[in-house]
Design a protein with these regions (language model features):
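Boundary at the C-terminal end of the N-terminal hydrophobic targeting segment
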Residues: 20-28
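Compositionally biased low-complexity segments at domain edges in trafficked proteins
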Residues: 113-167
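Short, acidic Ser/Thr/Gly-rich low-complexity loop/linker segments typical of extracellular
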Residues: 60-71
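Short Pro-Gly-centered beta-turn/loop motif in secreted/extracellular proteins
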Residues: 73-82, 89
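A short, solvent-exposed loop/turn motif at the edges and junctions
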Residues: 85-102
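Structural motif
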Residues: 26, 32-51
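Positively charged n-region of N-terminal signal peptides that target proteins for export
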Residues: 1-4
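Bacterial N-terminal signal peptides
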Residues: 9-17
Length: 167
């Protein structure tokens, strides 16, 4: 199922989720060429202690861990596309795509921006053998107004089977 949410609906939905951070210090207020990103993790049947968060921008990957409360904080460059992957043993991994192109469009030109969102990791035992078809959310900015847009896709598909090839 693919849906498009308004920024207001996203803010309401995300305001009820938890809190935590990849680095000990929160990111400083960013210049208009960067965007601060804050993700809150909620882990069903567990803690965020062994969650790994991987960020990929332009083929370069970096990773970190959330703080004790499940909060992840980092800064992304503008005019880039980032894939953020959330992994926890025994849970279904999720990815979020963040496109910072058009972030400075419209009334937002020259203003500091930030993105806040929540991620819930469910136990793999609830959906055995299934994975998400792709990023569960795609966050971007409207080209004319600069307003944030969000599309979600929570379709589950069978996991690719790893098979040994014998020669």
């Amino acid at each position: 199922m693919i849906r498009r949410l308004s920024t207001f609906a996203l803010a309401i939905g995300l305001s009820i989720l938890g809190a935590a951070s990849v680095s000990a210090n929160p990111p400083a207020r960013t210049a208009s060429d960067k965007v601060a990103l804050y993700a809150w993790l909620q882990v069903a049947n567990g803690t965020a202690q062994d969650v790994i968060v991987e960020v990929e921008v332009n083929g370069v990957k970096d990773w970190g861990r959330p703080n004790q409360d499940g909060r992840v904080e980092f800064v992304l460059p503008t005019n880039e596309v980032a894939l953020i992957h959330f992994h926890k043993p025994g849970h279904i991994s999720k990815s979020v795509k963040v496109d910072t192109h058009n972030m400075q469009a419209g009334a937002f030109k020259g203003k500091r921006r930030s993105i806040d969102f929540g991620v819930v990791l469910e136990p793999a035992s609830e959906q055995p053998g299934l994975v998400y078809a792709g990023p569960v959310a795609s966050i971007g900015f409207d080209a004319t107004a600069g307003e944030m847009t969000v599309e979600t896709d929570t379709r589950l598909v069978p996991a690719a089977r790893q098979q040994s090839i014998v020669f």
